[in-house]
Amino acid sequence: MAKVRVHELAKELGITSKDAVTKLQELGEFVRSASSTIEAPVVRKLRNAYPAAGASKSEAPAAAPKAPASPAATRPAPAPGPAAPKAPEPKAEAPAAASAPSAPAPAAPAPAAPAAAASAPSAPAPAAPSTGAKPGARPAPKAEAPAAPARSGGQGSAPRPGGPRPGNNPFATSQGMPRGRGGDNERPPRPGNNPFAPSQGMPRPGGSRTEGERPGGPRPAAGAGGPRPGAPRPGGTQGARPGAPRPAGAPGARPGAGGGNRPTPGMMPNRTERPAPAGAGRPGGGGRGPGRPGGAPGTGGAPGAGGGAPAGGGFGKGGRGRGGTQGAFGKGGAGRGKQRKSKRAKRQELEQMSAPSLGGVSVPRGDGNTVVRLRRGSSITDFADKIEANPAALVTVLFHLGEMATATQSLDEETFALLGEELGYKLQVVSPEDEERELLSGFDIDFDAELEAEGDEELEARPPVVTVMGHVDHGKTRLLDAIRNSDVVAGEHGGITQHIGAYQITTEHEGAERKITFIDTPGHEAFTAMRARGAKVTDIAILVVAADDGVMPQTVEALNHAQAANVPIVVAVNKIDKEGANPDKVRGQLTEYGLVPEEYGGDTMFVEVSARQNLNIDELLEAVLLTADAALDMRANPNKDARGIAIEANLDKGRGAVATVLVQSGTLHVGDTIVAGTAHGRVRAMFDDDGSVLTEAGPSRPVQVLGLSNVPRAGDTFFVTADERTARQIAEKREAADRNAALAKRRKRISLEDFDQAVAEGKIDTLNLILKGDVSGAVEALEDALLKIDVGEGVQLRVIHRGVGAITQNDVNLATVDSAVIIGFNVKPAERVAELADREGVDMRFYSVIYAAIDDIEMALKGMLKPEYEEVQLGTAEVREVFRSSKFGNIAGSIVRSGVIRRNSKARISRDGKIIGDNLTVETLKRFKDDATEVRTDFECGIGLGSYNDINEGDIIETFEMREKPRV
């Protein structure tokens, strides 16, 4: 089966595209929009979810032939006798039998309806009686109830179909006029009486017809029709007629459509000119209200004669008269009754009246306790769907609250809190953990229930996972190097660990071989997030403290991470062989943070080691195992699908995305389909820390995995899924959620107060960056450090793209479009990419140590700030005498008391210590009669301040200039 688009399948099932998309999301299938294509299994799943829709669709061709059939042929005519409360009438035969004797019975099933319609033309047309009476008509009523003129518009002698006339029923689903089965006497619909018909012309079914051919005789004048049976219609329904034939025509038929031209609005009878018979009642309702006795012809109720019918005549009490033709051409008839509003319309009006208005729009409000849950990075449209409001109205409300956003823009939690407080809602942004739990529940994945279902007999012992933490340059990597007997420090730049490594060693403990897994987390403050993730996956933390430096800020930070995760701590006092080492000082300092040594009566093990001299390494490993056995229950179930943590990932040139993962439970096999964060794929190969090929990895085993679609982030969880499609859908949903959350976090809030100023200044300056690195953890740490740089409100830093691997041509193209700077961390571009960057003028910078990158970007941000100016005083002058000049105004004859007075400099005048003139300019400066550029201390001069003339003797003129203030 080929792929099907969602909207095509929705049309086939008879549902809307939005309902189809929503149903697919409920079924756990991720589709982006109604234009997305879905596979055959998903199509079958959606078809099974709508069995009724599919059945009705398949039955539609069989039901289609029913449409041409007359209503009288599809249902038996009701007995008109019991429904006539005023005048009894005899039982009438079905019109179908009168018009088509060869047609099958009305009770024939649906498939026989086309055959009945086909045989109808073969029925002979009955001869028109000379009296104008219709066959099978009801007998004329008594004389005290004169009948109105009979209606015409078809073949005068042919009986009309007995079905309902939906053209007169405003609540009918179809406004068309059903066609009869009378062959040549077939009566077409009268669109002139149907205000909803596309054509208002009156068809002529029988060709041209002269006045003498009418069975009812000559037409009467307006309002002077012949008698009409005054008995009410049986049933009293809203315009629906039973299957009985209509009464016979009187000697004068109602003025209606016959021969001649087609009716137009100008041919309608004028209400003021038609003579009404004596004693006639007012016209009946225009098709809605109950018919009144009498009235002019064609105005809704049946026309009556002078005597009038009994009360409730016309079409009977509770019946509905036929609407006039005025409604078909414009304004309805004058006798139209008052329409009643439906309950739905009344409810909508009530909701609109009760909805408060803010900023000219009506929005539903909560009671102050209404809780609305939103995902991270939700938009106004998502919030509007929750409260059933118009997104445009919420945008207007937010605008009046001083915030600007579009309906589809991701908003942060503060903006939603402001909007919810105004509308009376308590908005709760779902945490990442709850969001992940809800996402997995859509795929029937529940890890919590799985853990509860495990029994003790299924659990087996596993090695402890140890994290080495501590301050920068305190010897963590060298200590791990001493444990592994390998050298990894030489590959680090500046002796700083740039990414996480995971290793497993084997040691002897109490005569048995025990395995220990080590995770080396960076100690630099920029890697706080990575160290926090390392503390979450570990069982025991080794806190490395240099004996000569003691406790440092990152030592305290690492200690707090371990304590927050309830991780037991073993303290390794390193560098005891160095001069100035004081292990007792370290013990005393850590006691202040709750780590009391066993020597002091506490429960924390302190081991003095020297990584350089390989001193007491075995004692440290023994302390780790003793702490693990005493404080932890290190067991896991290896007989299930694997779950764990992605410790580190990078992009290898020959192998693609390579992820270092730590299996926490279950067993990971080659060929398993896994999803790790936003990456997914099938495990093509596994390697241990020595490069050996593995086929499976049990709990607490770190391995390198090949086969992922992209590079996961450090700290992302991974687990095995049933198939690749499920893994891909989970990864795509995670990616969409992370993208919305990042957009909401990166959004720069602009209030209305400074919006005009920001526009006038050329908008907000933004430094766009593209970050590329060798490993994902380093890129993420660099991004976090850069986003923490605070240089004021005037500059915004924006990371438009981040990735792992070499700088590519796509990166240069993106930087060209967005005027971005490319930052390479331990990566270089290809030669062709570098030439493209030079040709496009893209700035690329390369770093191997994170300090230099942070410092350079911080300086660049400060250089982008608007220049700040400060006032610098140049000099002061005292006014000795004021000279009046018609050309230059008042000239202040002054003596310079301090500094220098320069021409065109800013000035202010103070009198008795109070400033009386500010923001002035020294427009003229003279020494005697000569112009001067500047005048120094103790020299006399003449100062002209332009049009400012409020100068008196004794005033002080102070001059100054605005100099750019250097940033620090």
UniProtKB/Swiss-Prot annotation:
Region G1, residue ranges: 470-477
Gene name, Swiss-Prot/TrEMBL: infB
Keyword Magnesium on entry: no
Predominant place of localization: cytoplasm
Residue spans of biased composition, Gly residues class: 281-336
UniProt protein name: Translation initiation factor IF-2
Biased composition (Pro residues): 77-87, 103-112
Highest taxon in the source lineage: Bacteria
Keywords noted in UniProt: Cytoplasm, GTP-binding, Initiation factor, Nucleotide-binding, Protein biosynthesis
InterPro entries reported in the protein's UniProt record: EF-G-like_DII (IPR053905), IF2_II (IPR044145), IF2_N (IPR006847), P-loop_NTPase (IPR027417), Small_GTP-bd (IPR005225), T_Tr_GTP-bd_dom (IPR000795), TF_IF2_bacterial-like (IPR000178), TIF_IF2 (IPR015760)
Annotated binding of GTP, by residue: 470-477, 520-524, 574-577
Family to which the UniProt record says this protein belongs: Belongs to the TRAFAC class translation factor GTPase superfamily. Classic translation factor GTPase family. IF-2 subfamily.
GO MF, any single term: GTPase activity
Biased segments, Basic residues type: 337-346
Region Disordered: start-end pairs: 51-369
Source species of the chain: Arthrobacter sp. (strain FB24)
Gene Ontology terms: cellular component: cytosol
Region described as G3: spans on this chain: 520-523
CDD domains in the cross-refs: IF2_eIF5B, IF2_mtIF2_II, mtIF2_IVc
Sequence ranges assigned to domain tr-type G in this UniProt record: 461-632
Keyword RNA-binding in record: no
Biased composition annotated in UniProt, kind: Low complexity: 51-76, 93-102, 113-122, 128-170, 239-254
